[in-house]
Amino acid sequence: MESIGNILYSIINEIGKEKIQTTITLNVTVSREYIQMIIDRFNGLVNLTDENVGSLCEALLHFMLTTRTLPSVRKVTIEKMNLDVVIPNLHTLKDFPEKAIIIQIVKDSQGITEDQQRNITIIQPNVNNIWVVTKEPVSGNYVNYTAECGNEKSTSQRRNFHDILVDIDAFLEKTNDRSFRFFH
């Protein structure tokens, strides 16, 4: 079986990598359509286990962050806690946690454990700035982004994964982030 990354990039290439990049650079809200389109196509090709969905969401988020040139740090360890994504950077997280987001991508059905939650809140005390991506909704003291089809009802604590890039962009705008961005 092909790897999740290979399947993802074949879908992206079918749609048009440059087309996606140009379109979401001009209008970030269009990323919702592309993310949902990619998840739907992926769904037709691969069994959607929690692990597969987690791997897809992780790779797709990395692609979209790069495409939109949003500042991020990926796969870091702080205080013995592995973090998947930090927005915008580690300096901001350390010195101004209210201006930083931690995104954890869960690859099982359990969400994050109480110990993990406790450790993350030591690093990021603002629970609204802890975003957890899962296949289906899970409960916890954080914002939960789900890739589940039909999750159209968004609240402040439960969001659809296809909204994540728009929400990151809005967060950076709200916090007046001026991190250096590469433009293609």
What does each model-found stretch correspond to?
Residues 6-13, 40, 44, 63, ...:
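Charged/polar, solvent-exposed surface patches and flexible loops
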Residues 33-35, 45-50, 62-67, 90-94:
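A broad, low-specificity signal for short, low-complexity segments enriched in glycine/proline
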Residues 105-184:
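Charged, structured surface patches that assemble and position nucleic-acid processing machinery
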Residues 51, 62-84:
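A short acidic/basic microdomain associated with nuclease active sites
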Residues 48-49, 70-74, 86-93, 116-120:
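Short secondary-structure capping micro-motifs at structural edges
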Residues 1-56:
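Interdomain/boundary linker segments immediately adjacent to catalytic/signaling cores
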Residues 65, 83-116:
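Conserved catalytic cores of phosphodiester-cleaving nucleases, focusing on short active-site segments
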